[in-house]
Amino acid sequence: MFNNYLVSALRSLVRNKLFGAINVIGLGVGLAACALIILFVKHEFSYDNQFTDVERLYRIEATANIPGRQSNASPNFFGATFDLLPGDYEEVESIVRMQQRGGTVIKGETATPETFTYVDPGFLTMFDFDLIEGERDGILDAPGMIVLTEEMAIKHLGEGPWLGRTVTVNHIYLRELKVTGVLKNLPGNTHFKFDFLMGIDKLTYAPQLASGSTDLDRWNGLPFGVYIKLKPGRSIESMAASIDDWVDKYFPAQIQALVGIKGSELFTPRLMPVRDIHMFSPVQFDMRPPGKLSVIVGFGGISLLILVIACINFMNLATAASTLRAREVALRKVMGANRKQLFIQFEIESLIPAFAGLLFAMVAIELILPTFSEYTDRQLSSASMTDPVVLSMLVGLAMVVGLLSGLHPALIMSGFRPGKILQSNQSETGISSGLRSTLVLFQFMISAALIIITLLVYIQTDYARSVNLGYDNSNQLTVRGVGRQQEAESLETLTNVITKLPGVRSVSLSSFTPGDGPNTGLSLRVPGVSERLIIFYRSVYPRFFSQFDVQPVAGRLLSDEFAGDRATFVANPNVIQEQQVNVVINEAAVRILGFGSPQEAISKVYYRGSENEITSTIVGVIPNVHFGSPRAQVDGEIYMYLPDQVTDLLVSFDPDEFQSVSGAIEEKVAAMFPRIQTRIQHLQDNIADQYREEKVQSTLLAMFSGLAIVIACMGLFGLASLTIARRTREIGVRKVMGASSREIVALLLMQFSKPVLIANIIAWPFCWYAVNQWLDRFEYRIELLPWFLGIILLAIIATLLLAWVTVATHAFKVSRASPIFALRYE
């Protein structure tokens, strides 16, 4: 019996090639979209699950609530936690710290900039990354040891084996380190990102302040990532309930008195499960870009909508096709088929395209996944498709889609009364017609919503990337990593040499590249203000502001003409206690420092340092220029020139001269500093990188939305074919009665235009709410209302045109046909 069902279903599929192709391709694309999202979601929620006992691993994070500044969630915590926490919490089995610092790897006469990660000895025991060479026990227990990833080992040491070989690094001081381990390259699904591991030692963390405190024990900053592992069977709840009190217990009383709030209010601690860091930590700047639940929900919803549209196509086509199979169903009933048998028959006819669509989806995923993985910067593998969970989900999804899509057609067709059908040759019911209209309306509501949302997301992303940040970033390049390792005088000589190069307009130095993330905080005291303030500072060359076309709103800018505009940064304040430094601040800093206006701030002084204070005089105020990450709000900032704090070279060049200027700069840097490997980047590219995730998301949204619209049009094409076939006699009668081809085409187009117009109106409120919520996460956002009004008008035109073009092919064909062929059997 089953073979008969199967053969009949296959014959029906072959007989109706157009509708079969629409169903198979539509369902296949829908299932492929769902499969891609399943793989993406599985990857996003798999972060850090590879570690042994991951359910017992936590990171202690903190939110800095510094008076006068916006709160900032940090992935770091106090270095002193390492010595104090285990003694106060018996549930803590182990604790490790990590900190990343820039330096260079020396090989011959070449110095390659790299990032070094300092960790406590137990780091690779707590986090069991795969080792290629070396033994986990004691791998970083002594000074002079280093662990590399396989990629870095090949890069700096050539082919293995690598164990026991040495690497020369320059950070704080020049030293030769012995390779005690090589790790497999880190997987993509971990929040960690490092290439070199070195043990924390006292020499690296020599006292940096006059008090003798270091990052290892100071409390006025968050220098370390701090991770803990709980003992088996112990809960985090009691520790989470008392961690605020623990911070208050050890936080220095003098600092609490200076800022006027408790330590736990200044740096609010948070215990974050390691496996939740990627998706749920509020930290914005981490080792890797954080995951976004809203993105997963959004793309998951779109893939589901694509599948729903494909299902609607199937239901509409199958129900409409019943008019062409009415006599077949009636004859089957006359020959003895009961309703159950017919129901099974039509459900099998639904399942075959569904599973054919699944095969189509598997092939499509195999072809698309490498590009999708590269574009989303995720390590997704088609091997995951054979995972029992993923495979069972896809097979189950195909089965559910097939059964549900065929449910209504099966119920309608198996319930036909043969006498009525054979007498009238009609099978259409008011319920079926109304359902089809409702489903078409729903399809185009989805299509209209996707068009509106996709266009608004694209407009916002483009706006955020091109918004005026308050400075001229065109025709500017950055050379990273030239500072700190070199003498300040040599750097200034280099700037003078580069200034004379053809195509170069201006050169300056700074401690940052515009568009980068957080900068350094500075503790200071303002006369007449009881509490000490912490504010960001940046080191900039005197001509920095003029190079970026930034003008003061009060006072003047830094200049080489004034000796006080050049400071010297020395770790011990006792050395520079007599120094007076001129600074420029932004308008946000005016408010934080308590001045009523930019003009009032000019010539005012503040004092930095805590033991021997250094006098700083405000000589100028600039607007709230967005030199930091464009994702964050503009905070209060102080600008001064500290020659030994600059790290980056900034060059303004003539238009279209990037290649020649960057090549010439490489030559000059190599001649003066042969060990330095330069990293040159167009400044606009650096700023655009901040929105790479949004660009990827908008492109994927456009791609998925386009798929949904194409599938909807495919379904409408098939439905129009069936609808017009059902109305052939009616059209023939209308032509006999004098209707023109234009009137018949207009009649058919109007039938499909009404649900499209209604669908657009229904979609508008949802789109407004969804886009408005999404825009809230941007510091710079478009004015929604005027854009929304324009886009909804465009969406109406687009959806109507799509519907008309889809239906027009059939409409023009039937309008030109002779009524003789429609009425010859009447």
Predicted feature locations:
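Mid-to-C-terminal secondary-structure elements
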Residues: 120-133, 146-291, 495-693
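Membrane-helix entry/capping segments
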Residues: 1-11, 15, 19, 51, ...
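Interfacial "coupling" helices/loops that link adjacent transmembrane helices in transporter permeases
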Residues: 16, 310-352, 715-753, 810, ...
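Membrane-proximal juxtamembrane linkers immediately C-terminal to transmembrane helices
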Residues: 35, 42-65, 90, 130, ...
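Alpha-helical transmembrane segments of integral membrane proteins
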Residues: 1-21, 285-288, 317-351, 355, ...
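Small-residue-rich transmembrane alpha-helices
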Residues: 32, 36-39, 270, 351-418, ...
